Amino acid sequence: MRLLFLAVLRPHTGNAVTAQRVRAHLEAAGHVCVLKDAFDFESRSEIANLILAENCEAALALHLYRGGRLLQGHRIPFGVIFGGTDVNEDANQAEKNTVMGRVLEEARFAVAFTESMKEMAQAQWPHAKGKVYVQSQGIATTPNAAFNWNTFLQRSEINQSADNLHIFLLICGLRQVKDPLYLVDAFSAWHQEEPNVHLVIVGPEVDPVFTREVKAKVKRAAGVRLIGEMPQEDLHAVVKNCFAVVNSSVSEGMSAAILEAMDLEVPVLARNIPGNAAVVKHEVTGLLFSNPQEFVHLAKRLVSDPALEKEIVVNGREYVRMYHSWQVERDTYQQLIRKLEGSTED
């Protein structure tokens, strides 16, 4: 089949990585997948023209509101994949909620990353029961073997002997929902006690106004550095070399950065929110914190307790292999896409 796939494709963001992975799964099954950025289109008529021009027989959208609403009413079957903001944010706005409900009426299937996301969706839109499937994100990491860690440290202006360094890595697009400033004050105070600990924030400048605020704050914060977006393979190499990966988001669908850290055998400290608690079991596959002070307490514990670090790393890796298999994800999407075959009158 020729499929139109609409997603939010800001480079080096979780959505873009997910979309590229799903496209690869579908193309491996022999489908042609026309991947387009939902933000490039304003109206359904533009999508109608695109469907005609590309001769698309079916469609898929990552994000019900941003992508799915553009696929309605074209008389081609489509499926949707929930994004984190769909159920965590957009569903709380009456107008968007109604739009997403209509999208689900027309969609042949919907994919949620977690069981709790599925439950939230079915509570919001009871008519979607039976249409929502759970498929967690499949994880495959590809660290750049030629990546130079010392050059990265210099670029981050961290000039110390690399032996006793503890680099905590926060990977996120600079926007408010990711809350990159949540830990900055507490971390900076810790760095002043222990100068070998550093927090490096890596990610694209998504929200220009908020980015200015982040840059201004980080500039004044000892022990905290901000680095722009990086190619996926380089980012995986940075993760592999750092001491721990941190997530301080206000809400998450399913953080690929957390799962990739587990896959690369690096401990994870994550803010205790439903999306993170769905993948991080406290003191088993990672550590969960509820405030900046607790983060520092847990980070200090991790630094001083190699046995805890080892246990978390082993369990995290096992968890990803068991529940986030790339092959299982491939099989699921290749099966679901068959629901789009056949006429729209089925």
Curated annotation (Swiss-Prot):
InterPro entries: Glyco_trans_1 (IPR001296), Glycosyltransferase_G1 (IPR052622)
Name by which UniProt lists this protein: Glycosyltransferase 1 domain-containing protein 1
Keyword DNA-binding on entry: no
Secretion signal, residue range per the UniProt entry: 1-16
EC number(s) stated in the UniProt entry for this protein: 2.4.-.-
Family matches, as Pfam families: Glycos_transf_1
Compartment(s) of residence: Secreted
Family to which this protein belongs: Belongs to the glycosyltransferase group 1 family. Glycosyltransferase 4 subfamily.
KW Signal (keyword) present: yes
Keywords of the record: Glycosyltransferase, Secreted, Signal, Transferase
Gene Ontology terms, MF aspect: glycosyltransferase activity
GO cellular component: cytosol; extracellular region
Cysteines paired by S-S bonds: none
Gene symbol of the encoding locus: GLT1D1
Top-level division of the source organism's lineage: Eukaryota
Enzyme class, first EC level, given as a word: transferase
Chief location category: secreted
